Design a protein with these regions (language model features):
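N-terminal cap/lid segment of alpha/beta-hydrolase-fold proteins
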Residues: 1-50
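Short substrate-entry loop that stabilizes the transition state in hydrolases
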Residues: 46-51, 60-102
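The conserved beta1-alpha1 loop
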Residues: 58-60, 184
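Alpha/beta-hydrolase-fold catalytic nucleophile elbow
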Residues: 94, 134-136, 158-161, 183, ...
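Primarily recognizes the serine-hydrolase "nucleophile elbow" in alpha/beta-hydrolase
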Residues: 112-173
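The feature captures the conserved acid-bearing segment of alpha/beta-hydrolase catalytic domains
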Residues: 156-206
Length: 251
């Protein structure tokens, strides 16, 4: 089997993606001798007192501990550039989902990443109270954790071709008013799509604020693998969804 090409970028582009400001290899957490790193993508030309909403990109897994860090993958480099060129701050970061037994540790890493950015809001030009989490693939359970905890600074959640845990109770209570965007790949593994379909049914039963887009011919990773209009439409709609909901004032 051919090795995965980790340099592949998303198939959707906007002007200015290469002009954004990037802080690379920022240490957001020390733990057991490990340094966990993030990259922070900001719009070009921000004034010193600017406060911009932020999108965190939560990679999937499990991935081997010695694998290329997700912050270096083309998909997350280009997503960071995309949201920064679209007027938001993008944060990509490495978390430690190395095995299926690591979800609690990965959750603590996600919490540490958000806390680092929020506690350095002035330095990073971010609005600490306007955050979106965008999860991918095996990172989906980290999104359903946010539905359970519902911190007030999280304004919306997005998930692309993600394994999603049952969330009926959360969607009927704390998560009912939290905007959620789901992107489904029609040619994905049946197990993954079964979890997405169940989540969508639960969200609708709970009258959640849900947007769901399906790519009928899309593969797992359609945003880098399938260079077609439907892939570009879904990515563009997801960015627009984040732009709208992180700036909403009715919460």
């Amino acid at each position: 089997m051919a090795e995965r090409d980790l340099s592949k970028r998303i198939v959707y582009r906007v002007d200015g993606m290469r002009d954004v400001r990037v802080r690379r290899d920022v240490v957001y957490k020390h733990d057991a001798g490990a340094e966990l790193l993030m990259n922070i993508y900001a719009p070009a030309g921000l004034s010193g007192d600017a406060r911009v909403p932020v999108v965190f990109f939560v990679h999937g897994g499990p991935i081997a501990a010695d694998y290329m860090p997700p912050t270096q993958w083309g998909v997350f480099v280009s997503y960071g550039e995309l949201v920064a060129a679209s007027g938001l701050v993008g944060v990509t970061f490495n978390h430690r989902l190395f095995a299926l037994t690591d979800y609690e540790r990965a959750r603590s890493d996600v919490a540490a990443a958000t806390e680092y950015v929020r506690s350095h809001a002035a330095e990073l030009n971010v609005d600490a109270d306007r955050i979106a989490l965008w999860c991918f693939s095996g990172g989906g359970p980290l999104m359903t954790s946010m539905l359970r905890d519902r911190p007030g600074y999280v304004r919306c959640l997005l998930a692309f071709y993600a394994y999603l845990q049952p969330a009926e109770a959360q969607l009927r209570s704390k998560g009912a008013g939290l905007p959620i965007f789901i992107a489904r790949a029609g040619l994905d593994q049946p197990l993954i799509n079964e979890t997405i379909d169940r989540f969508v049914r639960e969200a609708l039963a709970g009258n959640a604020m849900l947007d769901c887009m399906n790519h009928p011919a899309g593969r797992h990773g359609f945003d880098i693998l399938d260079d077609d209009e439907r892939s570009r439409e879904i990515i563009a709609r997801a960015v627009a969804f984040a732009q709208v909901h992180v700036r909403r004032s009715d919460r």
